[in-house]
């Protein structure tokens, strides 16, 4: 392990011990807010401190084993112990390096998922519906809660646009690499000559930001329109103007919500989505800067980035960012997304480790 990594780990272990002492102090216990914050930090550092202690013990074990190599009677046993300790040390080093990677504060949060039909007309809208069901099944398999914020149905099925909120621990961290362009190649049901058509949808995944962290929104910058909800997302056709459309005039961002019967609830949801979109726009600027410096699996943040192709005649799904091709399309469409998500997360960790090493 690099000396710079060891130095960081020693500092974190020292901080862990400090926190342990503070948490046993009656003065800290009396201050509930301070106690809560320190407890959270202590819990976050506990795994690193434990693994680093184990790693240090292994280094001492290897030194002891090496000292026994000169003894003919102990040589065989010492060699065996040394090899075993080396393997364990390498495994722990890898784990500790991953734990040292910079954390994205948004990863632990719930998210908003937007799916929009792109090129391909009716077939694109139908595919948007297929993507929505794919994510809904995945969310269900993870015991996440999915809630429709707004939905605009296509004329022949599917959706022109669908916005949902997915709630649960670590949702954004799992789904953030789904943002971008999703392309489908298949024979549409309306195609009489059996020709394969290519259509596209765009997906945007945005973390749900706590109210106190939302970008400042001035009411004078908003235009708020009300209208009657209809169709999916407001399946009950309302006789009152409960649906809300909010336009943020400086940026041109428009958000609609018509899922609730209450205008007040629709407005609250729409404001939440607006804040998430504004936060996402700020993040996109950072991503564009990073993308120009080094490869970034999130791309530039542009919705048109072509990230994935779903080829139905071949039963194939390809993620172009990591050149991953799987002939398991049925599984993917049924919500078994981990076979795509996990390789992306591993690649992302490898990229971060590489960047961390470059900084040293």
From Swiss-Prot:
SMART domains named in the record: PCRF (SM00937)
Compartments in which it is found: Cytoplasm
N5-methylglutamine sites (modified residues): 235
Biased composition (Basic and acidic residues): 292-308
Keyword Protein biosynthesis recorded: yes
PROSITE patterns: RF_PROK_I
Residues covered by region (Disordered): 285-311
Predominant location category: cytoplasm
GO cellular component: cytoplasm
Post-translational modification: Methylated by PrmC. Methylation increases the termination efficiency of RF1.
Pfam families: PCRF (PF03462), RF-1 (PF00472)
Keywords: Cytoplasm, Methylation, Protein biosynthesis
Highest taxon in the source lineage: Bacteria
GO terms assigned for molecular function: translation release factor activity, codon specific
Similarity annotation: Belongs to the prokaryotic/mitochondrial release factor family.
Function in brief: Peptide chain release factor 1 directs the termination of translation in response to the peptide chain termination codons UAG and UAA.
Protein name: Peptide chain release factor 1
């Amino acid at each position: 392990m690099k000396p710079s990594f060891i130095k960081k780990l020693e500092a974190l272990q020292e901080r862990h011990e400090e926190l342990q002492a503070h948490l046993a102090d009656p003065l800290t216990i009396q201050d509930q807010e301070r106690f809560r914050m320190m407890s959270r930090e202590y819990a976050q550092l506990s795994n690193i401190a434990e693994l680093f202690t184990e790693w240090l013990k292994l280094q001492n074990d290897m030194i002891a084993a090496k000292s026994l190599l000169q003894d003919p009677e102990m040589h065989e046993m010492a060699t065996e112990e040394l090899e075993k300790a080396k393997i364990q040390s390498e495994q722990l080093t890898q784990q500790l390096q991953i734990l040292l990677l910079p954390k994205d504060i948004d990863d632990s949060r719930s998210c908003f998922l937007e799916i929009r039909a792109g090129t391909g007309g009716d077939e694109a809208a139908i595919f948007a519906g297929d993507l929505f069901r794919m994510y809904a099944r995945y969310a269900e398999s993870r015991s996440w809660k999915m809630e429709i914020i707004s939905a605009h149905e296509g004329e022949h099925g599917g959706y022109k646009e669908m916005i949902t909120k997915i709630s649960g621990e670590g949702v954004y961290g799992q789904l953030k690499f789904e943002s971008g362009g999703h392309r489908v190649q298949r024979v549409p049901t309306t195609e009489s000559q059996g020709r394969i058509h290519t259509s596209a949808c765009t997906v945007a995944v945005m973390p749900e930001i706590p109210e106190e962290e939302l970008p400042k929104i001035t009411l004078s910058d908003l235009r708020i329109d009300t209208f009657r909800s209809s169709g999916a997302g407001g399946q009950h056709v309302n006789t009152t103007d409960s649906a809300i459309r909010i336009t943020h005039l400086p940026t041109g961002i428009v958000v609609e919500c018509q899922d609730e019967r209450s205008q007040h609830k629709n407005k609250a949801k729409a404001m939440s989505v607006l804040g998430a979109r504004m936060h996402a726009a700020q993040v996109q600027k950072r991503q564009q800067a990073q993308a120009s410096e080094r490869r970034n699996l999130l791309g530039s943040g542009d919705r048109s980035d072509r990230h994935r192709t779903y080829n139905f005649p071949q039963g194939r799904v390809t993620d172009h960012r990591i050149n991953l091709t799987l002939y398991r399309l049925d599984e993917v469409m049924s919500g078994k997304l981990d076979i795509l998500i996990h390789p992306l997360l591993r690649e992302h960790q490898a990229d971060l480790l590489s960047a961390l090493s470059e900084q040293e």
